[in-house]
Amino acid sequence: MTFSLAGRCQHTGMVGIVVSSSSPAVAARCAHARAGVGAAASQNITDPRLGTELLDLIKAGTPADQAVARVAAAAPHASYRQLTAVDADGVTGAYSGEHTLGRHATAQDPGAVAAGNLLAADEVPAAMLAAFAADPAAHIGDRLMAGLAAGLRAGGEEGPVRSAGMLICDAQTWPVTDLRVDWDDLPIERLRDLWLVWKPQADAYVTRALDPGTAPSYAVPGDSGR
């Protein structure tokens, strides 16, 4: 019911994740990222706590592959979970429990990991990784969106997807991008549209938080200042 891609930009250190599902509000439950730490997915029959546990372990110094193995070994009902993680060093890990639904697969490259369940084709995660790797100089958000779209083209889920989301962290303590389409007939297309609106404004919103006196105007009716 879900396919996801988590990645790290080797040039900027940004980390992020995209995810799509036939279930509503998938990003609210499955996508996790933390600045300077990494990104993780807890999916299939989801326990959102596991994404937090993965990032806590990575922050404490555990490489992503070992963090995934430790959480999978210790978590109750781990056989129902599918987990992935990428850390700030580009180490990746993936796990699919024996009760992962339907056709399922994972794929890993240095700096990126993809996984899916109830897939229409085994090649979906590999297609996502290939698209993410195609332009290493591009913004991580563009690369993540390319990966998500490639996963859909490769078959995506067995059924139609209905939600999607993107989460990206940079140097700040908050996500610099947190976009969600919680229910739509074409959620990946809508997420792409949101990204194209958000991308040129994202840096300005960081400036408004850190140094509002130099931030650009909102350029909306009634805004006479910053």
Task: Give the positions of each predicted feature.
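N-terminal nucleophile
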Residues: 1-226
